[in-house]
Amino acid sequence: MGRSDCLKCKTNDNMMDFAYLGKKHPKAPLAFNDLDHKVLKTVNNSFNCITCHDPHSAEPRIVFDHLIEAMSHPHYKDYNYQKNAGKTGYPKIEVINMGVRGYPRKIAILEKANSNYMCGQCHEGHNRSETFYKDSDSQLAHPKNAIDRTGWSVGTFFAANPIERWNVVRRLGLYNGIDKATGVKTVSTDHYHMETVVGSKHGQAGVGCTDCHFAKKANGTLEHQPSLPSLKYKNTCARSDCHGNPNGDNWSEGQAAYMVATIQQRYRIHKERLERYGSAARNLLIKAKNGDVKINQPEYQKLQDAYSLYLHTVGWYFSDYSKGVHDPSGFEKTSSEVIKNLRTATAAAQNTIK
């Protein structure tokens, strides 16, 4: 099967056996394009403390290569993390080269613990898992089957929402594939949990995954076992240092439950509208591709772009199991804009049909 780098989110038993970015190296026992069974033979434990904490100093750290790239490589200097590093919700990192075994390795120590980045090592969508083509000639933008993406940036753009990421990819003159039914160039998706939360109002206020998924215990410490906030509202959303603050929202458990239910109902409404207008655009694009109708080129291109963005948006949010809770206002704003684009582009295209 290959692509054994996926196993890095299941265990850290063999983390020191890979060269940085999983590149093949004569002294490194493993590489990211090794067969899965070869890597599995080196595994005895699931991921554990050392995934997020340095075993020598207990400092918060990152060991996932692709996230280190996104937070430190010059290719990413114009994207959200590096532009905001040092601000609330964007802790600085110290990248440490660890190549004492004869091949390059890196870790990154967080200036301040922030679970969005510690959990985000796995709960992110990085470019390494996708194949990119150039608009100019439809050829690969990187060497074929290059597991380490030689000459290609493998991190995440830290885009806070699908509109932002779609624009980044398309402005770079890239796409990931072609939708066969419509002929539309697509921008594929991964699970952008970290990117969504980091760019949300909660994330920018310094709230992290563990604030909601590690309930606060009676002694003031957090549980170290993830759970759904909805199972423990009293110790998550409605606790005194969050929305239960007597000088702030002062939510009760019932109010927290009601707010989450409201957000998720709004999500379902927007989801239905996205699918309705996406279906209308798709049907028209199929007719145009099959030659049943002819649309003026400017309107045809806008319709293709609107549908491509719709596909990216659907993939982005449908892989976020919170149903809008991770970024309520961001989801509503984004989905509303995508729906408006679909409606406008579809109507304009229909008006030019010959």
Segment roles from a protein language model:
Residues 1-5, 12-14, 41, 46:
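Long, charge-dense tracts
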Residues 6-10, 17-22:
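Glycine-rich active-site/cofactor-binding loop and its immediate structural neighborhood
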Residues 10-11, 54:
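Short loop/turn segments at strand-loop or loop-helix junctions that form parts
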Residues 18-211, 215-352:
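Primarily the internal scaffold of c-type cytochrome electron-transfer domains
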